[in-house]
């Protein structure tokens, strides 16, 4: 339990940041889900469009501190690999 005023403020700030970070992480997952749906549909053009929307969102999460850069690089790499597989 936070006793000092500064500790109470810190608890409130952490709760707010947690909500923001959850929203950002959810947004990334939504974009990845849209990409997966486009791939499942088999339409190369829509999959490429979904990837072009998805990749900047992942990198934005990195710049905001939600994802680690290596995690983002791994996610993007796997998405590109799957996109190329449908193209071939």
Swiss-Prot record:
> In the record, what terms sit under GO molecular function?
small ribosomal subunit rRNA binding; structural constituent of ribosome
Q: What does this protein do?
A: Binds directly to 16S ribosomal RNA.
Keyword annotations for this protein, in alphabetical order, are: Ribonucleoprotein, Ribosomal protein, RNA-binding, rRNA-binding
**Recorded GO CC terms:** small ribosomal subunit
Q: Pfam families in the record, alphabetically?
A: Ribosomal_S20p
Q: Which GO terms describe its biological process?
A: translation
Q: Outline the segment boundaries, as ranges, of region: Disordered.
A: 1-22
Q: What is this protein called?
A: Small ribosomal subunit protein bS20
PANTHER family in the record: 30S RIBOSOMAL PROTEIN S20, SMALL RIBOSOMAL SUBUNIT PROTEIN BS20C
What protein family does this chain belong to?
Belongs to the bacterial ribosomal protein bS20 family.
